[in-house]
Swiss-Prot record:
Described function: The pyruvate dehydrogenase complex catalyzes the overall conversion of pyruvate to acetyl-CoA and CO(2), and thereby links the glycolytic pathway to the tricarboxylic cycle.
Linked pathology: Spermatogenic failure 70: An autosomal recessive male infertility disorder characterized by azoospermia, sperm immotility or necrozoospermia. Hypospermatogenesis and meiotic arrest have also been observed.
InterPro entries associated with the record: DH_E1, PDH_E1_Alpha_Subunit, Pyrv_DH_E1_asu_subgrp-y, THDP-binding
Gene3D superfamilies with a match to the protein in the record: 3.40.50.970
Any single Gene Ontology cellular-component annotation: nucleolus
The protein's name in its UniProt record: Pyruvate dehydrogenase E1 component subunit alpha, testis-specific form, mitochondrial
Compartment(s): Mitochondrion matrix
Effect of residue 227 to V: In SPGF70; uncertain significance
Chief place of localization: mitochondrion
Domain of life: Eukaryota
Length: 388
């Protein structure tokens, strides 16, 4: 179904000019300049640029990454319904421009922490599809050895996946404090949703980050619904980019990977200059419900979802740009689609056949190093044994 959808889209792109993309100029055979939406600003005299250059290599990379995240999430949906995945599972299809654009705007040595809707960020931070799907199915080959599941995945310079709404806010500020304490040039992206924006601990993190001028980019992924509650019903002020009060803010088109990239570069440079934290609101949209137990159509209409798919889909926006600026051909994008499909299928095969972890694995990685003391007379390294 997805393959047919993409094929129709690519044929349409090839037959007529892009509706949503303005090509400012064509520099060479390997890059093109595009106009992007201007960001709304708060406590800032100037913001990110309104034009940006996209190279062919960058465009192909972003397209592959966004398509991989989309298909990975759809495969996770399938595996959940087949009962290979149990427990909580929050999908981010529709929000691919956020995770890909954010990663494109920072360095690998920078740090990222996010909420439980973490699969896309896990992938863009460097985890393989195989290790992500295997973690979802609770297998040994998962990035957390099958013990973390959907909400608790980790890799180098990525700190999860956090199950408590808004809890990553203070943690992100703490990571930024470590960066400042060490005196390096690194920053921390701290992501949270529009629902978490109403949590008190987010405001507390704002306060300490501003007080100590921490290199922290607070990022509100506003997908318009906190679980099943719209932003208009939950927030006295839905202008989340102004919620920092004394922290400058940007409102960004979160459905445009280039807009997210340029805004992230701007915010990262702001933090690296020693000015303290900055707040970004990414206006985005999730196609699935809040979680797998939420059909996602009781508080919004199917027509609303379809309108976003047809007019603002982040993958289609990039496809339009690539094809109409001749940075890529329809055939090239189809080939990438076939390669991504195979990668996802192979990863799913691994995730459903790899062995589950041994029971005693539950007792591992509780302490960072061997404990030289006893806790209330108990040996903390006693292996868990089956009661059967």
């Amino acid at each position: 179904m997805l393959a047919a959808f993409i094929s129709r889209v690519l044929r349409r792109v090839a037959q007529k000019s892009a509706r949503r993309v303005l090509v400012a100029s064509r520099n060479s055979s390997n890059d093109a300049t595009f106009e992007i939406k201007k960001c709304d600003l708060y406590l800032l005299e100037e913001g990110p640029p309104v034009t940006t250059v996209l190279t062919r290599a960058e465009g192909l990379k972003y397209y592959r990454m966004m398509l991989t995240v989309r298909r990975m999430e759809l495969k996770a949906d399938q595996l959940y319904k087949q009962k290979f995945i149990r427990g909580f599972c929050h999908l981010c299809d529709g929000q691919e421009a956020c995770c890909v654009g954010l990663e494109a705007g920072i360095n690998p040595s920078d740090h990222v922490i996010t909420s439980y809707r973490a699969h896309g960020v896990c992938y863009t931070r460097g985890l393989s599809v195989r290790s992500i799907l295997a973690e979802l199915t609770g297998r040994r080959g998962g990035c957390a050895k099958g013990k973390g599941g959907s909400m608790h995945m980790y890799t180098k310079n990525f700190y999860g996946g956090n199950g408590i709404v808004g809890a990553q806010g203070p943690l992100g500020a703490g990571i930024a404090l470590a960066c400042k304490y060490k005196g390096n040039d690194e920053i921390c992206l701290t992501l949270y949703g529009d629902g978490a924006a109403n949590q008190g601990q987010i405001a507390e993190a704002f306060n300490m980050a501003a007080l100590w001028k921490l290199p922290c980019v607070f990022i509100c992924e506003n997908n318009l619904y906190g679980m099943g509650t719209s932003t208009e019903r939950a927030a006295a002020s839905p202008d989340y980019y102004k919620r920092g009060n004394f922290i400058p803010g940007l409102k960004v088109d979160g459905m445009d990977v280039l807009c997210v990239r340029e805004a992230t570069k701007f915010a990262a440079n702001y933090c690296r200059s020693g000015k303290g934290p900055i707040l970004m609101e990414l206006q985005t949209y999730r196609y699935h419900g809040h979680s797998m137990s939420d059909p996602g159509v009781s508080y919004r209409t199917r027509e609303e979802i379809q309108e976003v798919r047809s007019k603002r889909d982040p993958i289609i926006i990039l496809q339009d740009r690539m094809v109409n600026s001749k940075l890529a051909t329809v055939e090239e994008l189809k080939e990438i689609g076939a390669e991504v499909r195979k990668e996802i299928d192979d990863a799913a095969q691994f995730a459903t056949t790899d062995p589950e972890p041994h029971l005693e694995e539950l007792g591992h990685h509780i302490y960072s190093s061997d404990s030289s003391f006893e806790v209330r007379g108990a040996n903390p390294w006693i292996k868990f044994k089956s009661v059967s």
